């Protein structure tokens, strides 16, 4: 049994449901199988490695309804976003309760098994409204929810095969491993940072403000499915490595991927992101403006307000920062809390504007993005376009 270092896992125990034995794999090949998508595979992996502790499988009806309606599991543990396995009615009809099934990817690989304990039909309109705060199909998370299978299967899983993370493999670690790493580094307070975007000056500023108060920064970028106009994960990873190389102390930061899909659930997803980082061993977590948001579906500081209301229950400390910008008169990064000057002296660009500049090959102002980082992003996006044109 491996030692679990650091902060207590969410719900009290760090889950590990991995079984990579040949005997288990061979037994799984004899089971009835269900083909699941990449989103489901990433959820399966996070349940299996303990990132989603205390979950031990895809949610059964009692947990699902409790989470949708009360933001807590049936056990009373806070949990904000349903982790479900949706299937078609036709597939559901073929699967009997209390049977074990193999979970396959489109590649034919058996990634895990599941003991089917429950089959139920969710109220997707209610789930959308309570989790995403909208039933609008233009919302990417809601769109995916509606496109998902109409029947949910619930039950305990085993992880038999981890997905190949390709170029990111050197930056992949499980919660047990990150906790040991923090222990070996002597870090007692670790602040986690979630991102699906490149790190620009505003992100750098709030990360370093937090880093002044803790032992180490756990930079944990999401590399699973995102929406089409987000910057691709492989391009972002190059930008992370570049900014860490030139602008961060090497002994105070660790870069590890978060192999999850992006739900764009705003405030509710901010809580999920914090739970996962707690399981990875973080004692602290940064909640920025419009955390996990998309479009205008959520208020600028709505995620911060929700997470403040559950801070004691979460058992973590949260860093919450105002919108930051570069002030020409101050000659530095600042927020409204620290800068007395007007908007005419502030340099700040939206993520959409910065993405367009980068796509057009334009280096944003150095007050917005580090030139080294911008160049890596421009080159990476250009390379992606060329690859797409070749196909």
Swiss-Prot record:
Pathway connected to this protein: Sulfur metabolism; hydrogen sulfide biosynthesis; sulfite from sulfate: step 1/3
Family statement: Belongs to the sulfate adenylyltransferase family.
EC number annotated for this UniProt entry: 2.7.7.4
Highest rank taxon of the organism: Bacteria
Keyword match Magnesium: no
Gene Ontology MF terms: ATP binding; sulfate adenylyltransferase (ATP) activity
A Pfam short name: ATP-sulfurylase
Presence of the UniProt keyword Transport in the record: no
Catalytic activity: sulfate + ATP + H(+) = adenosine 5'-phosphosulfate + diphosphate
Organism (species): Lactiplantibacillus plantarum (strain ATCC BAA-793 / NCIMB 8826 / WCFS1) (Lactobacillus plantarum)
GO biological process, one term: sulfate assimilation
Protein name, UniProt field: Sulfate adenylyltransferase
Entry keywords, A to Z: ATP-binding, Nucleotide-binding, Nucleotidyltransferase, Transferase
